[in-house]
Amino acid sequence: MNRAFSALSAASSRASASVGSVAPVAALTLLGVTATDLRSAVIFVLCLVVAIAFHEFAHAIVAHRLGDPTPSRDGRVTLNPLVHADPIGTVALPIMAGLLHAPLFGWGRPVMTQPRFYTRKINMRAGMALVSVAGPLANVLQAIVTLAVLKILMVAGVHNAGLTDVLIIFFSLNLTLAFFNLLPIHPLDGGKILAWMLPARYGHIDDTLARYGWTLLLALMLIPGLLLTLFTPVAIVRDWALRLLA
């Protein structure tokens, strides 16, 4: 009796484990998610984690060099991607967007900086502009390096479709992040750069953009086709750059 009960319990445990492992697969199948979708989502997230790590590190190191101890105190003057990744914006949402065929987007943990600590050699607005432009510049540099790697692989005769796909995704992602973050909307980097560039008499423009910044960002995300149209220059630059490799 005990042996029969033990055997039944073991069989029941194996069945439960089997059902538990099959359930997520079944759920993804019902949602129309394929293995290709899952692979694309994972690749995008990995590329995003690296791109954001350099982006946020650039913000942190420039603020640190200007005299602000805040990024160093917060442990942000590092290239460790885990420090800069946001669990929701860098991992969860991009994966869900990729699996559900929604537009891929994401963000990292913003670097906190206090302009009052900046060196007095520049004013605080100029300091904020330098810190802000460092992030998109880091993305542009990553895109250039990635393009160079693609060219080297082609010249060396290395033909690996998987690696090429990943590098092209990383290249395109960095171009997109640079362009998007330079939009003159708060809280994006471009908003802080615009605040520095505007003469004092046009300060009300910056105030308006700061007040309605999140509303404008939501509109960009939610209005069908608007974000895609806005990113047309990115697609043109990407296609032009990739044609140069041929």
Language model: regions and residue ranges:
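Hydrophobic transmembrane alpha-helices and their immediate loop junctions
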Residues: M1-A246
